[in-house]
Amino acid sequence: METAIEWITAHEILDSRGQPTLEALVGLANGATGLAQVPSGASTGTFEAHELRDGDPKRYGGKGVLRAVENILGPIQSELRGEDALNQARIDQLLIDLDGTPNKSQLGANAILAVSLATAKAAASAVGLPLYRYLGGPFANLLPAPLMNVLNGGAHADNNLDIQEFMIVPIGAPSFREALRYGAEVFAALKQVLRQRGLSTGVGDEGGFAPNLDSNAAALDLLMTAIEQAGYRPGEDIALALDVAANELLQDGQYHFEGKARSAEQMVNYYEQLLANYPILSLEDGLAEEDWAGWQAMTARLGSRVQLVGDDLFVTNPARLQKGIDSGAANAILIKLNQIGTLTETVSTIQLAVQAGFRTLISHRSGETEDTTIADLAVATRAGQIKTGSLCRSERIAKYNQLLRIEDELGEAAVYAGRVGLGPRGLPARSR
């Protein structure tokens, strides 16, 4: 069998934060290979699949991944040798069964995911297809709207902003290439505005600027100014999006935000004010991962006006997503491959979301590599949205460049999601 897995190798490498992660290389009988590298998050949900670390304080502060590498070279390779790489579902089920734990803690979700993705890449190579086409079939032609994280706060930066990500979304662009240009020009304008005001232009983990500001609203004002200075119309050409990462704010049942302890209802009141004043079309993790009652109330109040994205709430887990669907919590899900740990489970979660009318956003992690799989996955699944950081740092730009290549390859068949990818909304213009 030409597409049988013949060998698997793995290496400990570094991610964009200088922390260890791993890569796996899968080789098939016909000579095709697939290389995959896995990311790591900073603000992680409690219910994510387990990332296996060595725990040896003498190496990388205990964060080495040599045990995960050994699991790939040993039991995983033994289990998969001779299996057909074209049967992704079987490969992933074998990995899940071999691990035998609910959260992949025996072999490590990082080890399992690296092999799962590398297998898919090897299979795509074996049949002579680009990854997005191999995974998505003939109708994979939708380029996602990028949610570009240009101002960083929270766990992604050393500053005084509580909200973790302030994003721009080029909804009015006619193509992905133009969307990327819109974003790059706003990013350049934002840097100029920060310099003019004597503010820091140092960047956070995801490439966004990380200045100290008077308030979270001041960060939004900066974005509005930068959009206008770049020659674009807020709410028409470029909209805004936020990732609050509210788990990081929760202490003793209350949200500690801008120096005050707030209830879930008070947080929702705050978001409602922001929606009235700014063209915000997406709000991620506005409340904590176990605040189901708060999420239900927030969705009832705001869900018709804004995309409410569950990241820590759902952790790409179909069981948690089903709970959200059944209880009316959120209306969109962030998809992170390493939260669940295999390609098959990731795609199954996306399918469940789509069937329930939830929107899907394919996402990077704060600790990234040069791997571009999520760009192909976004096109393959017709997700319509992607989060892969700012307009600097090569591990972020790599994904954008891959999307440019895909769009060029698709030619006239390419469709840019734009505003439609985030749903038709009457976004308010600046009303302050």
UniProtKB/Swiss-Prot annotation:
Active-site residues, as the UniProt record annotates them: E206 (proton donor), K336 (proton acceptor)
Name of protein: Enolase
Source lineage: Bacteria, Bacillati, Cyanobacteriota, Cyanophyceae, Synechococcales
Claim: Metal-binding is one of the keywords in the record: yes
Disulfide bonds: none
Any one GO biological process: glycolytic process
PANTHER family in alphabetical order: ENOLASE (PTHR11902:SF1)
Binding site for (2R)-2-phosphoglycerate: Q164, K336, R365, S366, K387
Cofactor(s) needed by this chain: Mg(2+)
Protein family membership: Belongs to the enolase family.
SUPFAM superfamilies according to UniProt: Enolase C-terminal domain-like, Enolase N-terminal domain-like
Gene name for this UniProt entry: eno
Functional note: Catalyzes the reversible conversion of 2-phosphoglycerate (2-PG) into phosphoenolpyruvate (PEP). It is essential for the degradation of carbohydrates via glycolysis.
Pfam family, one: Enolase_C
A cellular component term, taken from the record's GO annotations: cell surface
Catalytic class of the enzyme: lyase
Binding site for Mg(2+): D243, E284, D311
Keyword Acetylation appears in the UniProt entry: no
GO MF term list: magnesium ion binding; phosphopyruvate hydratase activity
Pathway(s) of this molecule: Carbohydrate degradation; glycolysis; pyruvate from D-glyceraldehyde 3-phosphate: step 4/5
EC code(s) of this entry: 4.2.1.11
InterPro entries: Enolase, Enolase-like_C_sf, Enolase-like_N, Enolase_C, Enolase_CS, Enolase_N
Superkingdom: Bacteria
SMART domains assigned to the protein according to its UniProt record, in alphabetical order: Enolase_C, Enolase_N
Reaction it catalyzes: (2R)-2-phosphoglycerate = phosphoenolpyruvate + H2O
